[in-house]
Amino acid sequence: MKWDVITVTFNSSGVLESNWSWYQEWSDQFNWIVVDNASQDNTVEIAESLGARVIRSSENLGFGAGCNLGLRSSELPLVLFANPDLRIQPEDLRVLEETLERESCLVSPQLLNLDGTLQINGRGKPYLSAKLAHRGLKVFRSRLKTYLPEPAESGISEVTWIMGACVSTKRETLEKIGSWDEKYFIYYEDHDLGMRANRLGVKVLVDSRLMWRHEWARATTSLNSFAWYHEFRSAIIFYRKYPELLR
């Protein structure tokens, strides 16, 4: 057994049941650690019934801090951070393992929406102008071509960062670049991880030979004040840390 799979949950009971019911058949192949951020529903009970080892937090620590709590509670050489709404293809872990053994990197399968369309989880440099273009500001739309690159056809492509919904790496690689920055409660912590990897020469990869579905429903596509507060707060933290991206 080489893999620790770490999932951070918060009121995630519905997506756990629909995406992780397969785990018990594979429980001898890898450890599944669920860090629960003080859910108010029956997430903990469902995770335990599915075979996960559950770590209960008495408060909502946020995504990065939850990932780090799971990381400190694990010990195997390979780590996969996987959202509760991610549909893992467990047989693909062998392919990810081969990539991680070849080089120091962060790597994810290509993610798909539930309807099979591409979900571009590998992104280019997160210049502020590119982020604004992605939010619909047309004056910067020329930035989107490099920010939202087309995945390689049946191969591996190098990007700047990958969505935190699915990140695999070696434990020793995380020790080199550092774990998740807990200053971000949610949003931008995956941008930050990718930027730190880039600076240290650690590649960030998307493997389009592997395709996993992700039930992505970003809260900031609606009028959710909690989500927007943390989006703006995390953006301020991020661009203060990387002022070279303010263009």
Where are these regions (language model features)?
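Short, well-formed alpha-helical segments that are part of the catalytic scaffolds
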Residues: 12-26
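Acidic helix N-cap motif at the loop->helix transition within catalytic regions
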Residues: 16-17, 41-49
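A conserved acidic beta->alpha catalytic loop
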Residues: 36-44, 59
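Glycine-rich, basic loop-to-helix element that forms the pyrophosphate-binding segment
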Residues: 57-74
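Short aromatic/hydrophobic "clamp" motif used to bind/position activated sugar donors
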Residues: 79
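Conserved donor NDP-sugar-binding/catalytic core segment of glycosyltransferases
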Residues: 87, 91-121
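Short, flexible, basic/aromatic active-site loop/helix in glycosyltransferases
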Residues: 126-160
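A short, conserved alpha-helix in the catalytic core of glycosyltransferases
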Residues: 160-211
